[in-house]
């Protein structure tokens, strides 16, 4: 038998007792050249995989929009793992600093890690430059950091919201390194329902209470139609003097308020 035919021999797939584990253990096919196959002397390649190995199952609804009096940020509080509801009290709005907020959509670990890292980098910027980092610079910093890991399985779609000397700022950043400036965004499995409410009721000159009501109604509508969103509506308002947490309303209470009210 030629040496080439030995080296190119396919790996056995799902054979019982493979690698001496016994007991009917089934192992995944790791592919030729994988560690432990006893055939390849070369080091395994740790590059970008040809196909994803883990299917990320997640769902959420987050939104943010700019208006005359700042930026409104709202999110639901349900965490899911496939069809399993893991928690109803997850905080999906991350407080980066007193003037910056970030939202979580995608993998909770990815969002939490990268936005905590962003908070640290923003603080270092302030200490070095003796001034607050701008919303544009913070969002660009996050986009540059995650772009280095493009294609490696990160799952993150976040909005960076804040107020700087240019006024209110809102940017969408995702794990592919995309960065978009805009006036209104919604991210997550329930975003299609939230957009419908926002598109109907949004205007830049909304009064403060009208903006609060619009955000609550948009998240409520998403939780009503999307099984992966629910829990409570956490509402924040970014103003010139910093952000404030406005309210946290259970969607069951909002159902009593909005179920019989038509969208204007």
Swiss-Prot record:
GO CC annotations, alphabetized: centrosome; cytosol; nucleoplasm; proteasome core complex; proteasome core complex, beta-subunit complex
One Pfam family from the record: Proteasome
InterPro entries noted in UniProt: Ntn_hydrolases_N (IPR029055), Pept_T1A_subB (IPR000243), Proteasome_bsu_CS (IPR016050), Proteasome_sua/b (IPR001353), Proteasome_suB-type (IPR023333)
Disulphide bonds in the chain: none
Upregulating conditions: Up-regulated in embryonic fibroblasts and neuroblastoma cells by antioxidants through the Nrf2-ARE pathway (at protein level). Up-regulated by the antioxidant dithiolethione (D3T) in liver, small intestine and brain (at protein level). Down-regulated under lithium treatment.
Enzyme class: hydrolase
UniProt keywords, alphabetically: Cytoplasm, Hydrolase, Nucleus, Protease, Proteasome, Threonine protease, Zymogen
Enzyme Commission number, as recorded: 3.4.25.1
Major subcellular site: cytoplasm
Catalytic activity: Cleavage of peptide bonds with very broad specificity
Propeptide: 1-59
Active site per the UniProt annotation: 60 (nucleophile)
GO biological process per UniProt: proteasome-mediated ubiquitin-dependent protein catabolic process; proteolysis; response to oxidative stress
Tissues/organs with expression: Expressed in uterus at the embryo implantation site.
Record's keyword annotation contains Hydrolase: yes
Localization: Cytoplasm; Nucleus
Binding of bortezomib, residues: 108
Primary role: Component of the 20S core proteasome complex involved in the proteolytic degradation of most intracellular proteins. This complex plays numerous essential roles within the cell by associating with different regulatory particles. Associated with two 19S regulatory particles, forms the 26S proteasome and thus participates in the ATP-dependent degradation of ubiquitinated proteins.
Protein family membership: Belongs to the peptidase T1B family.
Subunit and interaction comment: The 26S proteasome consists of a 20S proteasome core and two 19S regulatory subunits. The 20S proteasome core is a barrel-shaped complex made of 28 subunits that are arranged in four stacked rings. The two outer rings are each formed by seven alpha subunits, and the two inner rings are formed by seven beta subunits. The proteolytic activity is exerted by three beta-subunits PSMB5, PSMB6 and PSMB7. Directly interacts with POMP. Interacts with ABCB1 and TAP1.
Name of this chain's protein: Proteasome subunit beta type-5
Organism classification: Eukaryota, Metazoa, Chordata, Craniata, Vertebrata
């Amino acid at each position: 038998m030629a040496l080439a035919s030995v080296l190119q021999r396919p790996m056995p797939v799902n054979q019982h007792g493979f690698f001496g584990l016994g007991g009917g253990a089934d192992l995944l096919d790791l592919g030729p050249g994988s560690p432990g196959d006893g055939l390849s002397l070369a080091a395994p390649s740790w590059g970008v995989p040809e196909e994803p190995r883990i299917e990320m199952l997640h769902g959420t609804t987050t939104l943010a929009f700019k208006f005359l009096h700042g930026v409104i940020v709202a999110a639901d509080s349900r965490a899911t793992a496939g069809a399993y509801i893991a928690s109803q009290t997850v905080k999906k709005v991350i407080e980066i600093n007193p003037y910056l907020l970030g939202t979580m959509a995608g993998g909770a670990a990815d969002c939490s890690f990268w936005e905590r890292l962003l908070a640290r980098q923003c603080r270092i910027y302030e200490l070095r430059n003796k001034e607050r980092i701008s919303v544009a610079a913070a969002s660009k910093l996050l986009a540059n950091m995650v772009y280095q890991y493009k294609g490696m399985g990160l799952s993150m779609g976040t909005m960076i919201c804040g107020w700087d000397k240019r006024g209110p700022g809102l940017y969408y950043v995702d794990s592919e390194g995309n960065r978009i400036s805009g006036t209104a965004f919604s991210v997550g499995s329930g975003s299609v329902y939230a957009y419908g409410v926002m598109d109907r009721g949004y205007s830049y000159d909304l009064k403060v209470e009208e903006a609060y009501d619009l955000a609550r109604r948009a998240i409520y509508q998403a939780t009503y139609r999307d099984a992966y969103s629910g829990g409570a509506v956490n509402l924040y308002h970014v103003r010139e003097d910093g952000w404030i947490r406005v309210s946290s309303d259970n969607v069951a209470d909002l159902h009593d308020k909005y179920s019989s009210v038509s969208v204007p």
